Each structure stands twice: as C-alpha cells, then as structure tokens.
Swiss-Prot record:
It catalyses: L-glutamate + ATP = L-glutamyl 5-phosphate + ADP. Substrate binds at residues 54, 141, 153. GO terms for biological process: L-proline biosynthetic process. ATP binds at residues 14, 173-174. The gene is proB. It comes from Pseudomonas fluorescens (strain Pf0-1). Catalyzes the transfer of a phosphate group to glutamate to form L-glutamate 5-phosphate. This is Glutamate 5-kinase. Belongs to the glutamate 5-kinase family.
Amino acid sequence: MRSKVTGAQRWVVKIGSALLTADGKGLDRTAMGVWVEQMVALHEAGVELVLVSSGAVAAGMSRLGWTARPSAMHELQAAAAIGQMGLVQAWESSFAEHGRHTAQILLTHDDLSDRKRYLNARSTLRALVELKVIPVINENDTVVTDEIRFGDNDTLAALVANLVEADLLVILTDRDGMFDADPRSNPDAQLIYEARADDPTLDAVAGGTGGALGRGGMQTKLRAARLAARSGAHTIIVGGRLERVLDRLKAGERIGTLLSPERGMLAARKQWLAGHLQTRGTLVLDDGAVSALSQGNKSLLPVGVKLVQGSFRRGEMVVCVAPDGREIARGLANYSALEAQKIIGQSSDAIVGLLGYMAEPELVHRDNLILV
C-alpha cells in the first residue's frame, strides 16, 4: 500500500498554522527551514510539488500583538493581509537558499466555482510545476466572506490536488494521524494506518475541532481526503511534528494514516463539479429518480422531482436528495427555482406548455451531475 506514496510523482503538501508558528508568536523560521530542506530533497528526487500553506492569520496576529484569534471578519481579514506578506517572503527566502523559485497563488471559492477561472488556475499551476517552480497557495482571506470561503486549508488542498491531478495529498497536522478513538482521552486508542477514503466507519472516529490558530479538525481532513479521491489521489494524514516526516514518507515508512481512493479518476469536468462546495437549492426526488440516478450516467428529468427548495438560477449548483433526505447527487440546474417549481412531476414534453419555452428537456443533464 505504501508504494502509492513512494511512487507518487506529484505531491500536494498542506502545512497547518500550528506547524509554522512558534506557539502563536509569529512565524517559526527554523521550522520552515526544515520543511524546505525536506521539500527540496523531494524536488531533487523528481517529485513535483505544490505547497498549501496556512499561517497568514496567525502571523498577522503576532505582528499586531493579538493573543486570541478574533471572531470579527474584518479583523481576521486585516490579520491575513498583514501576515500573508511575511508568510510568502519567508517561504521565498528559505527556498531561494536552495536555488528554488516559488510563486504565490491566492484562491477563493469563486475562482474554482467558475469554469473559466478554474481552467485558468489549472493551466497556471501546471505551467509552474512544469517550470519546476514551487507554487505556494493559500486562501485569499482578505477578500472572502463566510459565504464563499473554503472553510479551511484542508479543503483547499484537496481542491488543488484535483486541479493539478496530484498522485498524493499530504496533510500535516498536530496529530499523528487518524485513531480509532480519541487518543487524548483514551490511552488504548490505535492509529489507523490504512483505510479507504469512503469507509463510513471513519466518520465516527473523526470528531473534534481545529486548534486555536486554525480552522480544520480531523473531520475536515477526512472530507478533504474524500474530495481528493475524486481525482484518484491518495491522502496521507500525518503528524507534522514527527522528525523528517516528509523524508520518511518518501522512504515508505509506515507512519500516518493513508486513505486510498474508492474508485478511479473522474473525468475533468466531473472533478470540477465535485469541487463545488456552495449549493443554492435542493431537489427532492421520488424513488424512481433515485434508482435511475444511482445506476449512473443518467440525467434528472422533471418528472422525477417531488419538491424544489431554496432559490437558485439556471446554471447554479443544487443538491439532489432522496425522500428520506439522503444526498444522492449534485448538479447544475438547467432551470431556475421558480421555473423548476412549475415543471416538476411533469414529462419533458409538457415543459413548453408550462413555461412557454424549453431550455433543455432535463432538469439536470448527466454531464453536469455527479453522484455523492
């Protein structure tokens, strides 16, 4: 199983705030230097690297003399703006000591939800990787709002893994990996060395929240692994405080939790759809539609929808749920919520009579639909 790690040619490495700061007192340049040494060694071994780095808010808090993470959005954004400057400069200077170039990329959810901007970001990242430049990526905290933020850099790292079609996503954390119980309260807790990303039993052991400086807990890391699996990537959740952890992963040492994809890589457009985290409405399906969609490669017709919830426009992402509320699929709606309410439960032949026109015979076309 660990051959999937040692043989991986394209890595996305995510390093959290707690591993980059000196107990919240600014950036730990020594620690960053150790990370850079390991990443340069990977580079020299032929591994293509993309770095997703947290730490901007924590670095900004230190510069401002704040000891507690603020809750007000404008204060967080101010801290991010101040801290991002120091963060990217620290990475650049440290990599430059080893003759490596870096490039800063700040992303928002809107960048990846818009198909054209998504493709532009993908092209830029691939060009940088081919030039042997190390992209340093962070969420653009200065401009995002709660409605459009990724929520945590674990999710961002998974979406970046999709973007660049990475073989391996490495999520470095302050825990040694995923355990079958909480090791902080249960001394008998055992590390889970390998599992499938879609294993439902993992949800029960992934409880907990993020630390004081970051936003992501183990649940977000599991969700990130499942998202990365959409593009066929394996994910390692591993303790960032383990000595020379990246070197040891490359050598095949059995550390951390390796989560493997449940199926092969999705087509490029489906990967993009899988990255849509913001949904605008819900379509409640009947049992027949649930059965049809579950078979795969089927479009959602109006006749199979019982209820429309929320407000959405044509082309926006909606969730498709079974009568019992289980999420079945997500897709881009061919009709607005108001239009959909008029045609649900009807055959496609009736659309023109009900609306006066027919944009598409399907409510959601199979090319714009992804099962979950």
